[in-house]
């Protein structure tokens, strides 16, 4: 297959730049503790300096993989699939989610919301970033809002973002891993005073699993 053909298939969403896929325990947010199959799609231009998967940014370093092959592997594991990145909405997610739905799987997405929403999702975890704000249409669709807290200023950003989601959206504050010792007391105090928020931890890192 020629490079131009591969690029066309990726642009259509029939193939995707797959960084990795693995079966593990969801470590964050509302579904923490649940067995899930993760599909990590390469490509992201949001540019968070504290990102713990910077190797996902350049889509060209990850092989274009046919959606059919991705789904065949995913269907061997949990009934829940989490699509993450990178920023998965860089690409057309319709072919992937349609194929996963055909297998009867529950499909979650973790996204910054920086690009228009494509695909059919059972759960949308919106994690907005200051450098590239979400598109306005995703806010009312978010089931979960997860704000990464690097410093105290992020608490104000969290409230600005929470004002845009639906009343049913679950609200989470999660410490940026390298700053957890510093910001965790801030988060705990804030959640105690503002109980509409919950604390999210990267429990998979404490468990030493992917």
Where are these regions (language model features)?
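Short amphipathic alpha-helical segments, especially helix-boundary/capping motifs
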Residues: 12-13, 44-48, 70-73, 132-135, ...
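Polytopic alpha-helical membrane-helix bundles and their juxtamembrane interface segments
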Residues: 3-11
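Conserved AdoMet/S-adenosylmethionine-binding subsite of the radical SAM
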Residues: 89-210
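Compositionally biased amphipathic helical and low-complexity segments enriched in hydrophobic
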Residues: 10-13, 156
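A generic structural micro-feature
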Residues: 31-33, 139
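A short beta-strand-turn-helix
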Residues: 26-29
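Conserved Radical SAM active-site core
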Residues: 3, 16-23, 35-38, 42, ...
């Amino acid at each position: 297959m020629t490079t131009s053909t591969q690029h066309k298939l990726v642009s259509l969403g029939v193939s995707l730049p797959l960084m990795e896929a693995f079966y593990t325990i969801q470590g964050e947010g509302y579904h923490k503790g649940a067995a899930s199959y993760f599909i990590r799609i390469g490509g992201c231009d949001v540019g968070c300096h504290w990102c713990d998967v910077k190797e996902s940014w350049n889509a060209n370093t990850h092989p274009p993989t046919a959606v059919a092959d991705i789904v065949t592997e995913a269907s061997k594991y949990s009934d829940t699939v989490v699509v993450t990145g990178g920023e998965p909405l860089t690409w057309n997610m319709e072919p992937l989610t349609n194929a996963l739905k055909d297998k009867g799987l529950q499909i979650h997405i973790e996204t910054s919301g920086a690009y228009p929403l494509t695909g059919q999702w059972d759960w949308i975890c919106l994690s907005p970033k200051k450098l590239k704000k979400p598109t306005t249409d995703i806010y009312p669709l978010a089931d979960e809002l997860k704000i990464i807290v690097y410093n105290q200023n992020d608490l104000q950003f969290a409230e600005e973002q929470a004002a845009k989601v639906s009343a049913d959206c679950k609200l989470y504050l999660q410490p940026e891993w390298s700053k957890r010792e510093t910001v965790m007391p801030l988060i705990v105090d804030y959640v105690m005073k503002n109980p509409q928020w919950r604390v999210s931890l990267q429990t998979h890192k404490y468990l030493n699993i992917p």
